[in-house]
Each structure stands twice: as C-alpha cells, then as structure tokens.
Amino acid sequence: MYNKIILLGNAQDAGRPQLGCTEKCCEDARRDTTLSRMPVSLGLHGEQFGIVETTRCIGDQITLMGNLPISEVWLTHAHLGHIEGLGQFGRESFNSKNVKLRCSDSVVDYVMKHPIWKKLIERGNLTFDKFKSDTIVPIEVPHRAQDFDTHAILFKGKNNNILFLPDHDTWEKTLDFVEYNNPKEWFSSLDANIILLDGTFWNSNELKGRIQANVPHPTVSETLDLIGEKSVNDPRVIFIHLNHTNPLHYPNSDEYQKVTSLGWEVGEEGMELNL
C-alpha cells in the first residue's frame, strides 16, 4: 500500500524548544528557529496517504507531506506527544470524515475514556480499524504500561522493511520480552534493514531538575555499546525521538560525530525512506 516513509519530526514528544526550558538547548532554538524540531511522526506515501503519531505539530507535519489527504492514522501508544494532535481531526479544525484510527485495544479504551477524543469517534471524524495489515505489523514492547501498551511498528515493502521504535523502557526489558539476546539479533529476525530507533537521551545524566529514571529510555550511549560499529550486513540504524537536551541535535557535537563515525545515523526532518 505504501512505498515511501517521510520522517516528519525527530524530537521527543514536546519538541524543541520545550515549554518551560530555559537552558541553552532551547534558548538557542528560540533565537534561531532553524534549530527548532517537531516531535516524531511518520508520513506514509503510496496509493493513499497516512500518518503515524498525531503530534501537536500535525498541521505543519501534514504540510511537510505535501498537504495530502490522510486516510488513516497509526498510533504506537498514547503518551501525550504521540496523540495530542488527534483533536485537529475534529469539527473545530479539519472536520474529517471516517479517517481510520489504527491502535491497540488498550489505546482504544484510553481514547474512549477522554471526552474530547471520544467525540471524534461519535461524530465520525475518526473510525477505529484493525491494528495491523498485510504490510504493517505492530510489535508490543515494554514502556510504562500503567494505562495502555506500547508497540513498535514494522513496515514491510518491496525494497526495505522499516522498524519504527520511538519508545521503549530498557534494552534489558525489551530483549527479554521479544526473547533475543541483543538488538542486532532481533532486527535480523524481523528482516528489518532500516531501524528508526529510540534515541531520547544521550546518557543517563542528561535531565536537570528531574529524576531521569522516571522517564525510562535506553540511552544512545548504551545502544552504541550494544550494537558497536556498523558492519556491511547490518541494518541502517537512525536515531530519532531526541529529547530537547540531547546533544545529537547538534551535527558538530562530539556525540553526533561518534554516532556517524560508527556508521550509524541521526534522523532529520524531511528524511525520505523507500519501502
């Protein structure tokens, strides 16, 4: 169905600059808007057009797609940055008609508990549909499952299989859950040759004034230790979902250079990937 994916944002849920942040990372982005970044989302191109995640920047992100008619929405989970754009499908804005909403049963339940989003279903702006297809395969992963579950999504194409994994708690939990010893083994088992991978934090001491352990994500440093240097048969690994504090936002940083020197990549808004 789809033959191309566009990365519509590479930042964590709150984007960059982030509300309330007065550190250099966000002050730089306020002074120079070329440094601002939208939250992670994917544009799906083919005979029809879809979007993965509905961020607060959904209007700008659909513009980045070419302002194309959206026939379906996929959600990996329901943390605010991945779902808050749903309201834009309502009658105050787009007033869409029967756009398919594809998400897990627990996310369906979560949507229906919230009056603003429930109205979108009742008014026919959105219609729940199956959370899988012949070429799009959700894969459950551990990630703060108090209210709903979280999934990675595998997109299967003629040329590439692309795994989208913006959020998970730890490699230890995820690998235990999927029953593989290391990330590369898991990626290989999925026949995935492009990985859009959770790169939220560079290290475990990145957040100031907050307990970082309360926002669990594998750090990029840890992931690099696990996957090492890219070899000829390895998939492309592209780090996405970068927190506003992450030095990978700066291409001239030592951290960015370390990623690329090992043969891996950092996602950029507008990046196109063929399926």
Describe these PLM feature segments.
Residues 1-65, 128-183, 188, 271-275:
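Core dinuclear metal-dependent hydrolase active-site scaffold
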Residues 47-102, 193:
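Active-site metal-binding motif and surrounding structural segment of the metallo-beta-lactamase
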Residues 105-117:
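A short, active-site helix/loop in glycosyltransferases that binds the activated sugar's phosphate group
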Residues 122-128, 134-138, 261-265:
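Active-site regions of enzymes building and remodeling cell-envelope glycoconjugates
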Residues 71, 99-108, 196, 238-240:
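Short internal beta-strands
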Residues 12, 80, 108, 202, ...:
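Residue-level marker for beta-strand->alpha-helix junctions and adjacent short loops that shape enzyme
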Residues 67-69, 91-97, 120, 186-191, ...:
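Short, conserved loop/helix-junction motifs that constitute active-site signature segments
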